[in-house]
């Protein structure tokens, strides 16, 4: 005689006589700890601490059945959980891939000893879209193989990806801004919230998509740090779906890991400046380079003029020395000539005196 699991909000199943005091719990919140689950199940006197977050073992089969009856479909940490008796895995030797089919095309699901039957109660059928936690419709009685019901935990990788990342209290992320967006546009968009820092960048996914899909409009990502932390949620609520440069943008709190990644990249590529980091354009860089070249040219021209003056001065001194006697200055020579002329005029001619 098979052991019947008590009625649950979803369906009734029958185990094939294998008694188990362990229950399987699915759809727990990813942040649930062992301590929280133990407190949740405390009144049912679990025999051991629940290992992981999927199984809990109790002192008896009756107690485990009571847990299934009371807690299947209950809310725990704002999520509906699904509880059923644990069924140990027993390999049947069937091939992993492919299933044998009957002549009518229906799948042959194994021996009767390995089947579990849905309840035959049809007086109050469930709605057509109601399904159990394994995705099997419960409105029509049918047989299913135990192996078709997954009892293992969800892959660790999926759980790790769904774990919430730490979010910033003052920085907003925009992932779909128009490619031509510049610092001035972003500051104008957030002017009522006094943005203190703006980063505009293109992520790896955006670069990859724009290389492969030429018709797709190019986009950039934006990080905006606000002056006050309390303005974060208000800015997201009021500006979300508003247009920035003609495109509706979607805002959310930035991940701290993304902020750190962008800031480190900016430190490597940015030119030191006292002003907040902005996006440098090719025109600005060309203008700055042109100014530096002009300054260097002016300096060289002044040096050339100074050298030319020095050379001209030395050349002039050399010419004057070659023309003028070296021992008598020019002024003294002129004075001697003048005195000689005066002497000749003042002395009488000797021939005239004799006569």
UniProtKB/Swiss-Prot annotation:
Region called Disordered, residue ranges: 272-299, 314-355
Span of domain RRM: 21-88, 170-256
Biased composition (Acidic residues): 330-341
UniProt-listed CDD domains: RRM1_RRT5, RRM2_RRT5
SMART domains for the chain: RRM
GO CC list: cytoplasm; nucleus; ribonucleoprotein complex
Keywords attached to this entry: Repeat, RNA-binding, Transcription, Transcription regulation
Polar residues biased stretches: 289-299
A GO MF label: mRNA binding
Compositionally skewed regions (Basic and acidic residues) per UniProt: 314-324
Presence of the UniProt keyword Repeat in the record: yes
Transport found in the keyword field: no
Superkingdom classification of source: Eukaryota
InterPro entries: Nucleotide-bd_a/b_plait_sf, RBD_domain_sf, RRM_dom, Rrt5_RRM1, Rrt5_RRM2, RRT5_SRSF_SR
Pfam families from the UniProt entry: RRM_1
Family the UniProt entry places it in: Belongs to the RRT5 family.
Cited PANTHER family: REGULATOR OF RDNA TRANSCRIPTION PROTEIN 5, RNA RECOGNITION MOTIF RRM DOMAIN CONTAINING PROTEIN
Entry function: May be involved in the modulation of rDNA transcription.
Protein name listed in UniProt: Regulator of rDNA transcription protein 5
Organism of this sequence: Debaryomyces hansenii (strain ATCC 36239 / CBS 767 / BCRC 21394 / JCM 1990 / NBRC 0083 / IGC 2968)
Lineage of the organism: Eukaryota, Fungi, Dikarya, Ascomycota, Saccharomycotina
């Amino acid at each position: 005689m098979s052991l019947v699991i008590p009625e649950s909000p979803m369906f009734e199943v029958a185990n094939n006589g294998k008694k188990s005091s362990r229950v399987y719990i699915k759809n727990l919140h990813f942040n649930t700890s062992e301590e929280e689950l133990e407190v949740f199940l405390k009144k049912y006197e679990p025999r051991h601490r629940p290992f992981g977050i999927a199984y809990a073992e109790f002192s008896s089969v009756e107690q485990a059945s009571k847990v299934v009856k009371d807690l299947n479909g209950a809310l725990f940490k704002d999520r509906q959980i699904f509880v059923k008796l644990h069924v140990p895995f027993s390999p049947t030797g069937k091939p992993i891939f492919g299933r044998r089919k009957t002549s009518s095309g229906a799948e042959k699901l194994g021996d009767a000893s390995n089947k579990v039957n849905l309840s035959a109660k049809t007086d109050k059928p469930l709605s057509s879209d109601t399904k159990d936690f394994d995705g099997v419709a419960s409105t029509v009685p049918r047989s299913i193989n135990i192996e078709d019901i997954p009892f293992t935990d969800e892959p660790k990788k999926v759980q790790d990806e769904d774990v919430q990342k730490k979010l910033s209290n003052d920085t907003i992320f925009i992932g779909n801004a128009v490619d031509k967006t510049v610092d001035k546009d972003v500051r104008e968009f957030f002017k009522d919230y006094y943005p203190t820092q703006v980063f505009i960048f293109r992520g790896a996914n955006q670069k990859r998509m724009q290389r492969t899909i030429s018709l797709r409009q190019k986009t950039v990502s934006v990080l905006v740090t606000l002056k006050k932390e309390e303005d974060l949620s208000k800015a997201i609520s009021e500006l979300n779906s508003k247009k920035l440069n003609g495109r509706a943008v979607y805002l959310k709190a930035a991940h701290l890991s993304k902020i750190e990644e962008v800031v480190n990249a900016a430190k490597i590529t940015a030119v030191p400046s006292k002003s907040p980091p902005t996006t440098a354009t090719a025109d600005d860089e060309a203008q700055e380079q042109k100014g530096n070249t002009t300054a260097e040219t002016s300096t060289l021209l002044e040096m050339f003029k100074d050298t030319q003056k020095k050379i001209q001065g030395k050349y002039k001194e050399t010419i004057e020395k070659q023309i003028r006697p070296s021992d008598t200055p020019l002024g003294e020579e002129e004075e001697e000539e003048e005195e000689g002329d005066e002497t000749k005029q003042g002395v009488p001619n000797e021939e005239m005196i004799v006569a």
